[in-house]
Amino acid sequence: MVSQRSAMIFAILCLFALPLAGQHQSTKPKPRVVVVGVNGMELDILRPLLLQGQLPNLAKVIRNGAYGKLRTVSAPNCPRVYTTMFTSTRPEEHGVTGFLVGGITANTNMLKEEPIWSILSKNGVTVGMANVPATFPVMPVNGYMVSGMLTRGKSCEDGVLCAPKLSEVEGGDAVYPKEMKAELLKNVGDFYIDCERMPAAADLKGHESEVINKWLDKVQLIREQQTKLFDYVLTNHPTDFTWIVQSCEDRTGHWLYPIAPFNVGYNPKIETVRPDAFPDQYIQFDKVLGTILKHVDENTYLIVVSDHGIKPLREFEETDPHAHMDHEKTTPVIAKHDFADGDDVPGAFFAMGPGIKRDLRLMGFEASVYDIAPTILHIYGIGQPEQMRGHVLSEIFESSENKVALQK
């Protein structure tokens, strides 16, 4: 009698449990994705450091995921490429074609296509953006946004890279929501939003050692501040989707490119002052990546991307007195790149996470900057908008099916 009664009670409990189980499945947590951008990082340059064991954190990502070269756009520069990654559309379609557009510094008001953070926000995904180029002024998201490169501050000229502190921002908002600015100033400090631009040739002559060492010290300070910002938002403002960018490698790489035969502007007075600076920038980034990896568990997707590879810029400054000017020779820009063809300077792509193949090398140009947004949407089970020109990097997944269909 007791056993029959127990069996009946158990059956009743099971019946009650069935809808609860179904309810639990319908509220399955959204995937967590962390994208780490690095300005100007090239896979071929990283290989010697990886073989020497000097990039242990990046090596961990490679062992546990997929990696390869990342095809970029023609005439690649940071705002042009990052906005292509955000939208998976051509620069002429999304509107941000360079540092200057119509004589005005590139900004989010120029966007003609919907960026990834807007699509995710509308689909209920919480979003965090920190120090990402071409995100000034910040836009409303389902989370937070802290702008990056091309944020305008006091004494910033149109089109010129400058490093305003958070308290010095002018002409728009650098933080969304606005009240988060005071929180960051209190807990992270009055950090530099972007990395210091390269010194001009005229500032170097006769003072190479002093100027270079002072500049590199400033670069390291900014890198440490950016790391503190990343650690703070990942700890105190966790989101389903986070995109953060480390920007210092681009400046150091362009300016201190050490390989004499490939650097028309090679100057031994500059390169011999700090021969460690070029490889050290990637070693320092690996330490930044180590901090980020503390926030990445086995259920998190980590994607590391660079907008383009690296080539020297200083040669133009040495040979062309108007290298920092536009065609009217009135508006300063940062410099002219020596690579109109993006395939000359491919970026790099690394990804690991649930269902991503391990130790998979993508050969040739299987991955493109156009593919980043579609692949992120795929992870969240969100359909790819018609205007996007990229495709899902299905080859990196063990299964081609959408990871999770969002409950709406």
Language model: regions and residue ranges:
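Non-catalytic, well-ordered alpha-helical segments in soluble enzyme domains
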Residues: 59-63, 116-123, 290, 298, ...
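His/Asp/Glu-rich, glycine-adjacent segments
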Residues: 89-269
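Short, structured active-site-proximal loop/turn typified by the sulfatase FGly-forming signature C/S-X-P-X-R
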Residues: 46-84, 92-93, 126-130
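Boundary at the C-terminal end of the N-terminal hydrophobic targeting segment
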Residues: 20-24
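A long, amphipathic alpha-helix that forms part
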Residues: 26-28, 33, 44-46, 216-242, ...
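Histidine-centered active-site microenvironments of extracellular/periplasmic hydrolases
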Residues: 301, 305-352, 406-407
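Bacterial N-terminal signal peptides
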Residues: 7-19
